[in-house]
Amino acid sequence: GYQAREEQLKVRDQKKAAEGNWFLSQSLAGMSLYVDRFAGTLKSMPSKLPHLQDLGVNFLHLMPLFESPQGESDGGYAVSNFRKVDPRFGSLEDLIALRKTMHEQGMYLMLDIVLNHTSHQHEWAMKAKAGDQEYQNYYYTYENRWIPNEFEQAMPEIFPESAPGNFTWNEEMKRWV
């Protein structure tokens, strides 16, 4: 939790909070990017920071980079482990090193962490499929199509061509997810 946060980051937090509406100040210019498409790996990112700073970028939003199933990553959004960086991008240590480098240079780092769904290989999904009611409650699951059909009336499909509908039948749970 926050108590375990590094002291220098707590000081930075307090300074920002003391500035009042700092988020309205236009002192931050952000950029979103995929690590692999911009720099290849997290270890390569520090060498790109001067270029970003030349552009006036001091706030970097990295698109999903946590472990997800090969070939089923949904662009990194089907996370199988929120505590592991996908090896294609590097390691958690590489991410921590990048964050430290950025902070030393007065830059901010934000991660795109998708908490509203997981991959079917995530620990929570595995426990839900094994019948653990606590973990089944982490997901919207239904025994029949009645409620999913109601959702489908107003909920736009994300991938209508490749994965039509917003619910999938899970044979292990015998439920719509």
Descriptions of predicted regions:
Residues L33-S44:
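Active-site mouth loops of central-metabolism enzymes
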Residues P46-L49:
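Short hydrophobic/charged patches on amphipathic alpha-helices used for structural packing
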Residues A29-L33, L60-L62, L109-L111:
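Hydrophobic faces of well-ordered beta-strands that scaffold small-molecule active sites
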Residues A29-V35, S80-R83:
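Glycine- and acidic
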Residues G1-S27, Y34, R88, Q105, ...:
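Alpha-amylase-like alpha-glycosidases and glucanotransferases acting on alpha-linked glucans and related
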Residues G40, H51-K100, M107, L115-H122:
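Aromatic-lined carbohydrate-binding/catalytic grooves of carbohydrate-active enzymes
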